[in-house]
Amino acid sequence: LDETSRPDVAQWRQKGADSLATGSITRLADGRWDVRFRLWDVVKGQDLGGQGFAVTTGDLRLVAHRIADYIYEKLTGEKGIFSTRIAYVTKAGAHYRLWIADADGENAQSALSSPEPIISPAWAPNGTQLAYVSFESRKPVVYVHDVASGHRRLLANFRGSNSAPAWSPDGRRLAVTLSRDGGSQL
């Protein structure tokens, strides 16, 4: 089945399917790939839409994630996360690394390497910045990392603890926990 054919929904319904994705991938004359898909509601017999993309070989994974996001949103009503990125910290021996990767763990890139702990990575809602806590100064300090440029800026380095960065929903503000005067405060 490709995206131009209407599937036999009765047959798929008998097999217990609720939905069906059909598609095709074709090599174009310029070396790119034409990727197309269509989603079907097998129960109602409805076409739920589809998309087409012309991409390079290097972008095939990204397109697969976009297709998965589209299908997930159509079936659940919630945005998919397949095209998003994750941030995580690893520790090897006495060395810590802050990593940024695709949601499936592929394309991991090291954002920071330190002999001191790195904790609490928190994405800005638009995915362009990442706040985290680093102990490079032998105390917790909050930084914001710009994903595109790789540059970071110091956000909170007050006396006491600076921790738990959390972005506002609009991404314009960042709340942090401080203990400047003995007790923890936001």
Region locations from a protein language model:
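Short, solvent-exposed, polar/charged sequence segments at loop or secondary-structure edges
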Residues: 1-34
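C-terminal/domain-edge helix-coil "capping" segments
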Residues: 29-30, 43-110
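Hydrophobic beta-strand positions in blades of beta-propellers and related beta-sheet-rich domains
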Residues: 37-39, 86, 98-100, 142-144, ...
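A flexible loop/linker signature enriched in serine peptidases of the S9 family
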Residues: 79, 90-97, 113-116, 133-142, ...
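Residue-level detector of Asp-centered blade-edge/turn motifs that repeat once per structural unit
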Residues: 80-82, 125-126, 169-170
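Hydrophobic beta-strand positions that form the internal "hydrophobic ladder"
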Residues: 86, 127-131, 171-175
